[in-house]
Each structure stands twice: as C-alpha cells, then as structure tokens.
Amino acid sequence: FFRENETVYMVMNYLEGATLQDFIITARDLKTQKVFRESTIRSLFDEVLRGLRIVHQHKMLHLDIKPANIFITDDNKAVMIDFGAAREVLSKEGNFIRPMYTPGFAAPEMYRRDSSMGPWTDIYAVGACIYACMQGFPPNEAPQRIDKDRLSLALTKLRGVYSDNLIEVVEWCMALDP
C-alpha cells in the first residue's frame, strides 16, 4: 500500500493459479464428504487473515471478501484480490459510499444504511468463506438469517466432519450482532 494524491494504491505481483471459488466448485462436483480438508481451510485462511490484518492496519476495509476474490496460487498460497470495493474508514460513523455486496458473504450491516461498518464486516465474510469451503455453497443471506437462522443447524450437521473449534470459529465470525 502507498498513498499519493489523496488516493490509496496497492501494487500486486502477477499470480498464477485459480480462485477459491473455482476450487470449491470443483470439489463440490466431486461430491466428497468434505469439500476441503480442515488443515487446508486453516492454512488458507491463516494467510487470508494475515493479509486482512494489513488492510485493517491501513484503516481500510475490503468489503467484498468472497471465494471469487481469494486467489490460490500454484504453490497453494491464498491471496486476497479485487479491492475495487475497498474503502477507507473515514470515521467511526462509517461515512463512505456503501459498496455493492455479494449475497451470502455480506454482513448484516451492509444491507442497512443506518449501520456502521468496520473490521467485523470483513470478518463476517471470512466466516462465510470458511462455511463455503466446508459446505460447498454459500450460507443464506444475512436478512434471511435474521428472519430464520439455519446456520447453527447446518453447522451441526458438520460436527464430526470438522472440529468443534472450526465450527465455533465460523459461528463467531458470522454472528448477526457482533
């Protein structure tokens, strides 16, 4: 990252590989019990969270974290891409233009004009991405979850396939009222 002319720039290397979404679709089509092994999920999202920490340290929010925006390099490293929706956090009130969002990966506050966004908004999306790696498809949209939350039921069915710890991480990330 660097700032120049009141604009934040990010320069990235050229990468070869595929998006996490591509891997999820391929694994889902194979119809295995686990879309991804837990060790793979933990390794990939350790890297995603390290990158997200840097974004947040620069007082920025990504605001469009989803499997299509997580790139897996040929040497199995995870890199966040597509910062087109990224916004600088200007104030605690979240005074900035609200970006478009992706259903299933957008936190509840992205659907409401009167809600503040912050690092928790990106964390919700990380949890939704982990969920997609476990289930093979995205979770229900946040407004549907507010009306009738089936997340816990869906995750309960994964107990024994994935550790209780990983399931609790997803529940924590995707809390409707963090």
Task: Give the predicted meaning of each segment.
Residues 5-19, 23:
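Conserved short submotifs of the Hanks-type protein kinase catalytic core
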Residues 48-60:
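Protein kinase catalytic-loop region centered on the HRD/HxD motif
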Residues 21-36:
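AlphaC helix of the protein kinase catalytic domain
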